[in-house]
Amino acid sequence: MTSLKLLKEKAPLVICITNDVVKNFTANGLVALGASPAMSEFPEDLEDLLKYAGGLLINIGTLTDENWKLYQAALKIAEKYNVPAVLDPVACGAGEYRKKVADDLINNYKLAAIRGNAGEIASLVGIDVASKGVDSAGVDNIDEIALAANEKFNIPIVVTGEVDAIAVNGEVVTIHNGSAMMPKVIGTGCLLGAVVASFIGLEKGQELKSLETAMLVYNIAGEMAEKRPNGHLPGTFKVEFINSLYEITDEDVKEFKRVK
């Protein structure tokens, strides 16, 4: 099974083209975990950096026409150097423009995984789910949404919510770890996309296990953070979450994982 130890040994360079609001939090989270983030946003620079990268995150949270072109350029370069790319289609169910951009990136470029909440992923496959911007109401059929997207796009899918679902090659697992504090801190979902990009390329042909490990590490770190003194307060939780990403071990994952 792909391990946190392997991530720390490889320390993959992860190029993050992400939401302006979350860049600092994302970079600190990846460093704490053991990856090496770069927040590059210029095609010529990406040409230089991606040849050394272990992963690329495309997060469409701060969406403009210029950024759309940047996403396209980055994905072309990533494919050139066989760098696994993860798409976070932020709020793609909230409006036609975001949906159009997400559809373009999925249909015309090579992706290693898509990570989104239930509302976002459901919108990509035409399933009706109550959603509001970047947030999504709790749903009971999250595994069905993940499988539907996996079957439609033939891409590994991670759907997050109160329960998380991972679908790869028609197989689905659900993760029942996590903290209710996570949605109360802006950027936790965006950082998760970067964490997925850190793990997805560690072992070729082991995408399901890599994604499962990424989700378990992330969610169990959230549980650890909430248990710290004042971890029930969002400001403290944010700091303790970074600390927990730094301290979590494979032994913690093995002990506390809840997978079905």
UniProtKB/Swiss-Prot annotation:
<keyword id="KW-0460">Magnesium</keyword>
<dbReference type="Pfam" id="PF02110">
    <property type="entry name" value="HK"/>
</dbReference>
<feature type="binding site">
    <location>
        <position position="187"/>
    </location>
    <ligand>
        <name>substrate</name>
    </ligand>
</feature>
<dbReference type="InterPro" id="IPR029056">
    <property type="entry name" value="Ribokinase-like"/>
</dbReference>
<keyword id="KW-0547">Nucleotide-binding</keyword>
<dbReference type="GO" id="GO:0005524">
    <property type="term" value="F:ATP binding"/>
</dbReference>
<keyword id="KW-0067">ATP-binding</keyword>
<dbReference type="GO" id="GO:0004417">
    <property type="term" value="F:hydroxyethylthiazole kinase activity"/>
</dbReference>
<feature type="binding site">
    <location>
        <position position="39"/>
    </location>
    <ligand>
        <name>substrate</name>
    </ligand>
</feature>
<feature type="binding site">
    <location>
        <position position="115"/>
    </location>
    <ligand>
        <name>ATP</name>
    </ligand>
</feature>
<feature type="binding site">
    <location>
        <position position="160"/>
    </location>
    <ligand>
        <name>ATP</name>
    </ligand>
</feature>
<keyword id="KW-0479">Metal-binding</keyword>
<dbReference type="GO" id="GO:0000287">
    <property type="term" value="F:magnesium ion binding"/>
</dbReference>
<keyword id="KW-0418">Kinase</keyword>
<dbReference type="GO" id="GO:0009229">
    <property type="term" value="P:thiamine diphosphate biosynthetic process"/>
</dbReference>
<protein>
    <recommendedName>
        <fullName>Hydroxyethylthiazole kinase 1</fullName>
        <ecNumber>2.7.1.50</ecNumber>
    </recommendedName>
</protein>
<comment type="similarity">
    <text>Belongs to the Thz kinase family.</text>
</comment>
<keyword id="KW-0808">Transferase</keyword>
<dbReference type="GO" id="GO:0009228">
    <property type="term" value="P:thiamine biosynthetic process"/>
</dbReference>
<dbReference type="InterPro" id="IPR000417">
    <property type="entry name" value="Hyethyz_kinase"/>
</dbReference>
<keyword id="KW-0784">Thiamine biosynthesis</keyword>
<comment type="function">
    <text>Catalyzes the phosphorylation of the hydroxyl group of 4-methyl-5-beta-hydroxyethylthiazole (THZ).</text>
</comment>
<comment type="pathway">
    <text>Cofactor biosynthesis; thiamine diphosphate biosynthesis; 4-methyl-5-(2-phosphoethyl)-thiazole from 5-(2-hydroxyethyl)-4-methylthiazole: step 1/1.</text>
</comment>
